[in-house]
Regions:
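ER/Golgi luminal nucleotide-sugar-dependent glycosyltransferases, focusing on the catalytic module
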Residues: 1-255
Length: 255
């Protein structure tokens, strides 16, 4: 069986699946009690000091630069790929290594099922929740450095659904190509976005942008993928999220 590793980005203690396919990694330079032997994103070649704005991508960068695996993936300590089974304890729904391997026999990439915003496009949802200037910067970067990606970018921005959460599993050669492109776009975006003026939430700007860039890269490069459901280990408070979603849409005033 191929060597498959899914990094579990963590910044605090939390219950973890025991399956060997999962590799917890402490992000942002934190030291979690009881996890002294876990991976850390501030060792080797890293961008750990950017965790505030890059979120779980600092774990991805570390894995890309420092971890040898035939397939490498990224999940979050509160959300995982799930097996296809109704009901039961949320923790028991986390996909096993065997199930991840079976999914990879169908395609070289696993993505989470698409999130649908229904009444918002990817573009309008972003500018209502964050800052339009972020997307303006990305579009300019693509136009200047990666013009072949502009058609997919326009298509993705115009859709009401997309793959979110910065969750995926990729064959190593595909991951190398994706990370090379994505981190270059984000590095260029850092030169153009003044994230220091953002609050803590919007300061996670490069993590948010990467969520929207994944589909752009996948489509431009015609990468085959399969999807798995996502299990959230904590309650999602959908009513509260829905109310905030509509409130942002109604009150939007940014140019």
């Amino acid at each position: 069986m191929e060597n498959i590793k899914l990094l579990v980005a963590m910044h605090k203690a939390y219950c973890l699946p025991e399956d060997a396919v999962y590799a917890p990694i402490q992000v942002g330079g934190v030291h979690i009690p009881g996890m002294e032997n876990a991976l850390r994103d501030d060792t080797g070649e890293n961008i750990s000091n950017k965790n505030r704005s890059y979120c779980e991508l600092t774990a991805l960068y570390w894995g890309w630069k420092n971890l040898q695996a035939d397939y490498l993936g990224l999940v979050h300590y509160r959300r995982y790929f799930a097996r296809r089974m109704p009901g039961g304890r949320k923790f028991d729904r986390i996909a096993s290594g065997t199930e991840i391997h079976a999914a990879l026999e169908k395609a070289p990439v696993i993505l989470p099922k698409k999130r649908n915003y229904w009444i918002e496009t990817t573009y309008t949802q972003y500018i209502h929740a964050h800052y339009k200037e972020d997307l303006d910067a990305v579009q300019s970067i693509l136009a200047e450095k990666y013009a072949a990606y502009l058609p997919a970018y326009a298509a993705v921005m115009g859709r009401t659904s997309g793959h979110r959460f910065n969750m995926f599993v990729m064959r190593r050669d595909i991951l190398d190509a994706y990370c090379t492109w994505m981190f270059d776009v984000l590095a260029e975006a850092e030169k153009r976005i003044d994230a220091d003026r953002y609050d803590a939430y919007n300061g996670r700007v490069y993590g948010f942008l990467a969520e929207r860039l994944l589909d752009v890269w996948m489509e431009t490069n015609h990468i085959a993928y399969t999807e798995l459901p996502v299990v959230f280990l904590e309650n999602q408070h959908w009513l509260k999220k829905g109310t905030a979603f509509l409130s942002r849409k109604i009150r939007y005033r940014r140019p």
